[in-house]
Amino acid sequence: GGVLKDTIQMIHGPLGCAYDTWHTKRYPTDNGHFNMKYVWSTDMKESHVVFGGEKRLEKSMHEAFDEMPDIKRMIVYTTCPTALIGDDIKAVAKKVMKDRPDVDVFTVECPGFSGVSQSKGHHVLNIGWINEKVETMEKEITSEYTMNFIGDFNIQGDTQLLQTYWDRLGIQVVAHFTGNGTYDDLRCMHQAQLNVVNCARSSGYIANELKKRYGIPRLDIDSWGFNYMAEGIRKICAFFGIEEKGEELIAEEYAKWKPKLDWYK
């Protein structure tokens, strides 16, 4: 979630729990890197753990929206302490949304002890999102070819580079999950004709659910490396029946980069 460019990421727990966030990664965005500039935490103290942290969370959510008046979307995460004391973050989120009708909040209840690996957190967010948020919004479709690009997080700007390829092919990306993406675009994932998965470990779950619930096919690619990327472009173009466009794009990119690649030989 921390890669989204228009969303407050609220970590409900002690300040230290907010350390391992997008600030340890390289997730730029095309709106001035909003997601990399700020860390939000409820900064729970011992008294909040003893007496409950729900009021602290509610106050922090309102403060964040007040400080960021242009931002209307938020994801709230539990941590080990807030999960152990049983804070009902979903109830708090509903109350804040009632108080602020123009905002939308998603909650992720996956404290660190939930699973043996990071993948558990991916699974909880993937399934929670499709259960609660997908198909709660519709966007304008401007192309006869549409897809979701899933499991790419714009590390060092790769999502933005790949977007130039999709634009040249005439493919509309309904939603990026989640590199350089937006909260509301992800609510429209049901509108795509194809789910292209780049990182299956983190995001294959939601692609599988979209196929099960909406009949959207899943296509796995690997975008790292010239030959792998060319293979991925061919697979996507074959699905849409635009193979000629794909070959033109691949030829243009090879011609552009071949002299530099040859240097390494």
Swiss-Prot record:
Q: Example GO molecular function term?
A: metal ion binding
Any idea of its EC number?
A: 1.18.6.1
Q: How is the cofactor bound?
A: Binds 1 [8Fe-7S] cluster per heterodimer. Binds 1 [7Fe-V-9S-C-homocitryl] cluster per subunit.
Instruction: List positions binding [7Fe-V-9S-C-homocitryl] cluster.
Output: C199
Against InterPro entries, the record matches this protein to:
Nase/OxRdtase_comp1, Nase_asu, Nase_comp1_asu, Nase_comp1_CS
Q: Which domain of life is it from?
A: Bacteria
Instruction: Give the matching SUPFAM superfamilies.
Output: Helical backbone' metal receptor (SSF53807)
Catalyzes what? N2 + 8 reduced [2Fe-2S]-[ferredoxin] + 16 ATP + 16 H2O = H2 + 8 oxidized [2Fe-2S]-[ferredoxin] + 2 NH4(+) + 16 ADP + 16 phosphate + 6 H(+)
Q: Which cofactor does it need?
A: [8Fe-7S] cluster; [7Fe-V-9S-C-homocitryl] cluster
Alphabetized UniProt keyword annotations: ATP-binding, Iron, Iron-sulfur, Metal-binding, Nitrogen fixation, Nucleotide-binding, Oxidoreductase, Vanadium
Q: Name one Pfam family in it.
A: Oxidored_nitro
> Binding positions for [8Fe-7S] cluster?
C17, C80
The GO annotation for biological process reads: nitrogen fixation
User: What Gene3D superfamilies does the annotation carry?
Assistant: Nitrogenase MoFe cofactor biosynthesis protein NifE, C-terminal, Nitrogenase molybdenum iron protein domain
Enzyme class of the recorded protein, top EC level: oxidoreductase
Family classification: Belongs to the NifD/NifK/NifE/NifN family.
Assembly and interaction partners: Hexamer of two alpha, two beta, and two delta chains.
Further comment: The structure of the 7Fe-V-9S-C-homocitryl cluster is assumed to be analogous to the 7Fe-Mo-9S-C-homocitryl cluster.
Q: What does this protein do?
A: This vanadium-iron protein is part of the nitrogenase complex that catalyzes the key enzymatic reactions in nitrogen fixation.
Q: What name does UniProt use for this protein?
A: Nitrogenase vanadium-iron protein alpha chain
Q: What is the originating organism of this protein?
A: Azorhizophilus paspali (Azotobacter paspali)
User: Coding gene?
Assistant: vnfD
